[in-house]
């Protein structure tokens, strides 16, 4: 891959490989994609949500990931979402998820993100395929790295994608200067610790609140869906870390709050619950999900609202 040694190209390459400082210990919200009742993307709500996270203290947002319901949107719609976000960054570091099962659309979406000023990419492996060989996955990601010059993290979420990011795959791609790291949403502390130990020069971001402690102990970042409902609680963890405060206590507060939400609507989709609590936090109209997810029932809304009010009461 040809690398631009001057200007923005050099800056991006450097950003992908920074080591040995606190630059990597950043907090991104794995942002929801707001829709109206008819299922249409709501640009105004997206801008308001971005400002909310900025004011809460987030370093950035990841758009069109799992919590953002990316498979529910067409390529054209995903470009609309990305363009809306990238035109309204306001100091947030913005990472776009361009992943699809086919490399042509993935590269197309990645090019679009690059052209509109994305700071990076988070790419899920080509899903649905039954145990694709390591050679095929290496070829898929190599084509992406050959086409786009943006810091790019690979998305390890095997419970959902059914295609894990392996150590062998990362080693095969390690020579690409724009390989930034991974997002590990597996929730497996042993596996995540191995990623961190094996690739200390990359940003091995935790996508699970269970592993934020491991991330920060090793100077790594986190990309958190819980940041939708609890943006400030997530930001408080990283503020405490940077200020040498009690960041472990801040993690415990986040875990307790999220457990209360999980218990209140165990049968609701994660995205629907996060959208509902975010709407309550912001005092805005309900933020809807897209099919195949379904909207919350009245009983689920009532239960979530009661849990939310109990959480808020403990903060006073």
Spell out what each predicted region is:
Residues 73-76, 107-108, 133-136, 165-167, ...:
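Short secondary-structure transition/capping segments
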């Amino acid at each position: 891959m040809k690398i631009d040694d001057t200007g923005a190209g050099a800056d991006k390459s450097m950003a992908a490989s920074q080591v040995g400082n606190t630059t990597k210990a950043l907090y991104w919200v794995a942002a929801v994609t707001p829709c109206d009742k008819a299922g249409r993307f709501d640009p105004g709500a997206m801008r308001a949500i971005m400002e909310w996270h900025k004011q809460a203290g987030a370093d950035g947002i990841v758009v069109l990931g799992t919590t953002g319901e990316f498979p529910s949107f067409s390529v054209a719609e995903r470009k609309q979402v990305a363009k809306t976000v990238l035109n309204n960054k306001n100091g947030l570091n913005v990472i776009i998820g361009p992943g699809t099962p086919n490399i042509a659309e993935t590269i197309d979406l990645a090019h679009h993100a690059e052209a509109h000023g994305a700071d990076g990419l988070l790419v899920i492996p080509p899903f649905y395929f039954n145990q694709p060989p390591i050679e095929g996955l290496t070829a898929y990601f190599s084509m992406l790295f050959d086409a786009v010059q943006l810091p790019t993290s690979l998305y390890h979420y095997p419970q959902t994608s059914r295609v894990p990011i392996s150590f062998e795959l990362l080693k095969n791609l390690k020579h690409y200067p724009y390989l930034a790291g991974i997002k590990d949403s597996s929730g497996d502390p042993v596996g995540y610790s191995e990623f961190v130990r094996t690739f200390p020069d990359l940003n091995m971001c935790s996508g699970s609140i269970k592993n934020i402690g491991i991330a920060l102990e090793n100077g790594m970042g986190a990309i958190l869906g819980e940041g939708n409902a609890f943006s400030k609680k997530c930001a408080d963890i990283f503020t405490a870390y940077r200020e040498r405060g009690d960041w472990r206590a801040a993690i415990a507060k986040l875990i307790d709050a999220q457990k209360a939400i999980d218990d209140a609507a165990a049968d609701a989709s994660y995205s629907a619950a996060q959208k509902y609590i975010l709407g309550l936090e912001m005092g805005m109209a309900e933020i809807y999900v897209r099919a195949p997810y379904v909207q919350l029932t009245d009983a689920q809304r009532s239960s979530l609202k009661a849990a939310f009010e109990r959480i808020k009461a403990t903060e006073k």
